[in-house]
UniProtKB/Swiss-Prot annotation:
The lineage of its organism: Eukaryota, Amoebozoa, Evosea, Eumycetozoa, Dictyostelia. It comes from Dictyostelium discoideum (Social amoeba). This is Large ribosomal subunit protein uL22. The keyword Ribonucleoprotein applies. The gene is rpl17. It holds the Pfam family Ribosomal_L22. Belongs to the universal ribosomal protein uL22 family.
């Protein structure tokens, strides 16, 4: 088996960890929406959020693949009206996040500061089955599995930007330099 190739390399490999699941038998559309919902979250918040989804306390907002998705009041927080609670996708994503957390601990990173920097969900190869129909016909019965990858990076303390001098100060300094 070949080494998994990630679609993105982290900017600081020493301060980041990765996790990847290939050909997972979970619906691509549900998994994509679930992964996009946690992108940019801290690891602790993402795990709490996904556990709340499993308990139906929060929902996953459906933005792209939303045809036929029912409405729920829990989606108002995200600025949309449609949402679901995709159990199987959330469980697989939680297991990948736990794997990434274990990888971070093995690297010696601070788990409390980990942020989900990169998420990618791709369609994996469809698996073919068949269903038998009337009059001796056979129709395909395909599944749409997913390949999911996460890159988590340790958040560094942001350095505050120095206050810029106002335009008036710059102008007065310029006139002083000319007169001097």
């Amino acid at each position: 088996m070949t080494k998994p190739v990630y679609s993105k390399t982290p900017s600081n490999p020493e301060k980041s960890c990765k996790s990847r699941g290939s050909n997972l038998r979970i619906h691509f559309k549900n998994t994509r929406e679930s992964a996009m919902a946690i992108k940019g979250m801290l690891l602790t918040r993402a795990k709490a959020y996904l556990n709340n989804v499993l308990a139906h306390r929060e929902c996953i907002p459906f933005r792209r693949f939303k045809g036929g998705v029912g409405r729920t009041g829990q989606a108002k927080i995200f600025g949309t009206s449609q949402g679901r609670w995709p159990k199987k996708s959330v469980e697989h994503i939680l297991s990948l996040l736990q794997n990434a957390e274990a990888n971070a601990e093995a690297k010696g990173l601070n788990v409390e500061k980990l942020k989900i920097a990169h998420v990618q969900v791709q369609r994996a190869q469809q698996q073919r089955r068949r269903t038998y129909r009337a009059h001796g016909r056979i129709n395909p019965y395909m599944c749409s599995p997913s390949t999911v990858e996460f890159i988590l990076t340790e958040v560094e303390k942001a350095v505050p930007k120095p206050a810029e001098e106002s335009a008036q100060k710059k102008k007065s300094v310029a006139t002083q330099e000319i007169s001097a």
